[in-house]
């Protein structure tokens, strides 16, 4: 059967223009150095009308991630592809939940869910991070202009960049004095 033989109508094939599919081969993609972290951009939103963005991150052993934060306008998903990444999930009472996501584990962080991550191990960690909408990829591009390769990113540098992308720090409850 060729395309001229396809019936068009409800429940039938719908004609569409050709829309190219994008492949980012392994080891390709825009590389952003974020101090000690490497970010490889897989989708910047330019092919998805900014509906989704994706990047692969590589964290060295023992690295703490950004300050605990939450996003006002975008959801994130994380797929661990190498090692173990630790998610710190601050709670209003000052405690936190911990998730250790191993290779193959998938974590979803909805809008307004407080979180951060770290690599508590002595092994390199890799994960793929998606965000919807895709505009958040620009946070990493901006952060890359703030920091020098090989130096850790300061909390102030993280927070300055986050403030441009509807991302707010978590207010930590201080322990009560006795």
Q: Which residues fall in each region the model found?
A:
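Long, hydrophobic/aromatic N-terminal blocks
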Residues: 2-45
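Short acidic-glycine-tyrosine-enriched beta hairpin
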Residues: 25, 91-112
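A short glycine-rich, His/Asp/Glu-containing loop-to-beta-strand
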Residues: 28-68, 74
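Hydrophobic small-molecule pocket/channel-lining residues, especially in calycin-type beta-barrels
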Residues: 45, 63-64, 71, 85-86, ...
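Short, conserved beta-strand element in jelly-roll/cupin
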Residues: 56-61, 70-91, 130
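Tight coil/turn sites that cap or link beta-strands
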Residues: 60-63, 104, 112, 122
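Short beta-strand His + acidic residue motifs that chelate non-heme Fe in jelly-roll/DSBH
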Residues: 67-68, 87-89, 109, 115-121, ...
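Double-stranded beta-helix
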Residues: 116-178
């Amino acid at each position: 059967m060729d395309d001229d033989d396809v019936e068009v109508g409800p429940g039938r094939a719908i004609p569409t223009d050709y829309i190219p599919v994008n492949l980012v081969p392994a080891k390709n993609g825009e590389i952003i150095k974020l101090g000690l972290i490497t970010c490889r951009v897989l989708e910047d939103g330019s092919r998805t009308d900014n509906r989704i963005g994706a990047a692969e991150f590589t964290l060295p052993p023992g690295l703490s991630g950004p300050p605990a934060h939450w996003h006002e306008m975008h959801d994130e998903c994380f797929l661990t592809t190498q090692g173990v990444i630790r998610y710190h999930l601050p709670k209003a009472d000052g405690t936190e939940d911990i998730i250790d996501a191993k290779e193959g584990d998938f974590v979803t962080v909805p809008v307004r869910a407080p979180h951060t991550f770290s690599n508590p191990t002595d092994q390199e960690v890799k994960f793929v991070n998606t965000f919807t909408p895709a505009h958040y990829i620009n946070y990493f591009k901006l952060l890359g202009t703030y920091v020098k390769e090989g130096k850790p990113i300061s909390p102030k540098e993280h927070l300055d960049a986050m403030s441009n992308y509807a991302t707010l720090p978590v207010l930590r409850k201080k322990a009560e004095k006795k």
